[in-house]
Amino acid sequence: MIEILDGMYETINYGDSLGIRLFHNDEYEDYPEHWHTGIEMIMPVENGYTVCAGKENYELRENDVIIINTGVLHSLKAPETGKRIILQFSASLLYSVKEMETLLALLPPIVYIPYDAKDEKLYEFVRSRMDRIVTEYDEK
């Protein structure tokens, strides 16, 4: 759900959530090419989802996770039915943590972590943190 789009620039409305926006998306709606200063994580929980960034199309399956870094031009294509979790957070949250600035500079534009990733520990780490954020966000 893009609320504020000026050309290709999306202003993320974090509301009162301290720089975090999460929504359970089940809309059959494609999102045009856009970019934002926040970092975005997407995980389909029912059916797939397509993320297009640059010349790459990422065909996400259920439980795959994709991380879209700040400033990356991307578009999203939804199937007719499905559900996905979309988490957007301000990069300033991470920049305030000691030594994260260097780490964020090394983060590639897109990080695609499939459910059946060879690096199971990475997937489990990212997924468990995402599940915890969703639980805490939904309880507030």
List the model feature ranges, each with a label.
Residues 57-59, 68, 103-106:
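A short glycine/small-residue-enriched secondary-structure motif
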Residues 45, 61, 69, 77, ...:
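Residue-level detector of conserved, well-ordered beta-strand and adjacent loop positions
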Residues 2-19, 73-139:
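A hydrophobic/aromatic-rich effector-binding and dimerization subdomain
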Residues 50-52, 68, 74-80:
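Short beta-strand His + acidic residue motifs that chelate non-heme Fe in jelly-roll/DSBH
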Residues 1-61:
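Generic protein-terminus/edge-of-domain signal
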